[in-house]
Each structure stands twice: as C-alpha cells, then as structure tokens.
Swiss-Prot record:
Involved in the biosynthesis of the chorismate, which leads to the biosynthesis of aromatic amino acids. Catalyzes the reversible NADPH linked reduction of 3-dehydroshikimate (DHSA) to yield shikimate (SA). It is an enzyme of class 1 (oxidoreductase). GO terms for cellular component: cytosol. This is Shikimate dehydrogenase (NADP(+)). Shikimate binds at S24, K25, S26, T71, N96, D111, Y230. It catalyses: shikimate + NADP(+) = 3-dehydroshikimate + NADPH + H(+). GO terms for biological process: amino acid biosynthetic process; aromatic amino acid family biosynthetic process; chorismate biosynthetic process; shikimate metabolic process. Belongs to the shikimate dehydrogenase family. NADP(+) binds at G135, A136, G137, G138, A139, N159, R160, T161, K162, Q163, R164, I228, G251.
Length: 290
C-alpha cells in the first residue's frame, strides 16, 4: 500500500505505480542511472489498487513526488486524469509517464519510443513496407503508432479476438488490415517485420501448438522478428524464429529505452541505455529465477 505520509525532500523523487508492482524492473533501472550519473534523487515502487489510484494521482505532488511511471492496470486511467496529454499519449489512448508543469498534470506514453529505440540498437536498418503484429492490447497500440511513424505502408493485425483487432484497426485508420489468426500463413511471406505483443506460450509453452503456431519457414529470410515480452528473454515466439534462421530482437531493450523519457524529465539528465545497464537487469532476472 502506498504511504501518503512520505516526507518531502530537497531532491527529485519519482515513482512507478501499479498493482501488482513487486515484479517491476523500473526502480532498478532508474536507481542504476541515478548512481551512474551521481545524481541526488530517488525512485520508488508504489503498490496502488484501482480503487485508490485516483487519490494517489491527485496527491503525489503534495507528498514530494515530481512525477512517475504508470504500469498495469492504470495506464488508461492515468491518461484520463491528466490535464495535458501529448500527441503520442492521445493517439495511443494511454499514459505511462506523468509529470507536473505548474499545476497541470501532464502525460505521455514512452512505449512507442522504447520500441523503436530498441530496434534501432539491434537492427538499425529495420523497416520495410509490410509489418505483421500479433495482439490487440494496449502495447499493440503503441507499436502500431511506431510502425506508422516509421513509414510502413501495410500493417497486418492478428488477434485471437477479432473484434478487438477490428476496433484497433478502426482507431488507427488506413493501412491496417485485420487478418484471421488461423490464416497467417497466407501473409507471413510478405512481412519485413514480425512483432509479437501477446503472452502466447509464456505461461504454458505447449499453448502454441494448440492455439497458435507461426511457421517461420514461410517468412522472408530477411524478416526481422521481435517480441515485447522479456521474461523469459528468449520467448517461444523468438525461439521458433531463431530455429528458422531469422534475425530476432528481444523485448528487454524496449523496457530500458522507454525509461529514458521519464528519467530525463524528472532528474534533468538524458541517460544512455548501455550494456552495463542491460547486464544489471539480466542479473536481477536471473536471481529472481533462482
């Protein structure tokens, strides 16, 4: 439970808020940067349920927070509560980064930047004409926006619940076509980029054989495959792609890069996503599995 009696400090203090929150890597990322750059500051995880989220958001400035990150299940509510939403948050319809400008609560969504920056790191020439995206949840919104900004002319959207995909395609307008989950083999060969935003096969590795199997042998040999899930680092989706000789990018970098936007705003330094940071987070993940 969030402690609304936290004392104010002379240095910046930021948060990540969600429920559950114990699994969040954000405190490790931000505190790594604070130490690296020799900055006075603090970044704390705050467990806040949906019933208490509104109160937390309207109170955090009074108890010494300058802003923070928002994770599940609060991103859409954070967007609704903000006085100012930038273009990215407005298009996505959800916010994961908050700060104050005067008395106005401001919001953006850094997932779009995080997704693109991660691919820039590992495949700087990523792009093309056609992309294939699996999933139609909140993360898919951020990625569809990133792909449209990158200039993809055709984006195929596939989701087990077709109506959700239809709604998302309608929200983003032209160039997005919804395709049947069980007919992906008909379009797989066209994709220059293949993105998974679902948790298929993560909790149950055998799930892919019953509900979904992507035959990457039918994909372009030059196709790039990425999964936004980073636990495990190499998901079943990426394993399938690797086994067919395709280049893959894991989802950890998206998490690291999306944190840059908030850190710069709260602490005044634009941090770098380095191998040292990635190694530190991977070590934490390894310890959690033991």
């Amino acid at each position: 439970m969030v402690d609304l009696t936290i004392e104010k400090t002379k240095y910046p203090r930021a948060f990540v808020v969600g429920s559950p929150i114990h699994h969040s890597k954000s405190p490790r990322i931000h505190n790594f940067w604070l130490k690296q750059y020799g900055l006075q500051g603090e970044y704390l995880a705050q467990e806040v349920t949906s019933e208490k989220f509104n109160h937390f958001i309207t109170s955090f400035k009074k108890i010494g927070f300058c802003g923070g990150n928002v994770t599940l299940p609060h991103k859409q509510e954070a967007f609704r509560l903000a006085d100012y939403k930038d273009k990215t948050a407005t298009i996505i319809g959800a916010a994961n980064t908050l700060w104050y400008e005067g008395d106005k609560l401001c919001a953006t969504n850094s997932d779009t930047y995080g997704f693109s920056a991660n691919l820039d790191d590992f495949a700087s020439d990523w792009g093309g004409e056609t992309a294939l995206v699996f999933g139609a949840g909140g993360a898919a919104r951020a990625i569809l926006y990133a792909l449209k900004e990158r200039g993809f002319e055709q984006i195929y959207l596939v989701n087990r619940t077709k109506q959700r995909a239809d709604n998302l395609a309608q929200h983003f307008g032209k160039n997005i076509k919804v395709y049947d989950w069980h007919k992906i083999h008909e379009i797989l060969y066209q994709a220059d980029l293949i993105v998974n935003t679902t948790s298929i096969g993560i909790k149950n590795p055998e799930e892919k054989s019953d509900s979904f199997f992507c035959d990457f042998h039918k994909a372009k040999k030059t196709a790039l495959v990425t999964d936004i899930v980073y636990t495990p680092l190499i998901t079943p989706f990426l394993q399938q792609a690797k086994s067919c000789g395709l280049k893959t990018v894991d989802g950890l970098g998206m998490l690291l890069h999306q944190a840059v936007i908030g850190f710069e705003r709260w602490f005044g330094v634009r941090p770098q996503v380095t191998k040292a940071l990635r190694t530190a987070i991977l070590e934490d993940m390894s310890e959690e599995r033991e």
